[in-house]
């Protein structure tokens, strides 16, 4: 059975919380976005010393990737899918025509989950999605900005 993750859907804004992401190496109290390299996802597990964003709650596993969107039409690392513990996480950006560029985070998982994208300290969340369904989070804002894409498992 093959499954495909769609790259588009609607997401609603959620409250802004702390930015997240970094290598998990018993670094209690680190700022989670410190040291993120654009296009390189970091996966965390509960108790690894990096606190997830408040919106994610206390997930067993969560991931973050920094996506730098510039005004070029070229899309290095524009769309990527990664196999993670409970499913397939896809993230990246695509053209939204005259509206700018859309940053997205989609996730198909065998457990309850959600996806979120963060731009300018505002979170756009898919909300909780049941197992074996795909979550979709995205935002379209201009031609050049930095976006953080997240997924998490219940």
Language model features by range: what are they?
Residues 1-83:
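N-terminal prepro-regions of secreted/extracellular proteins
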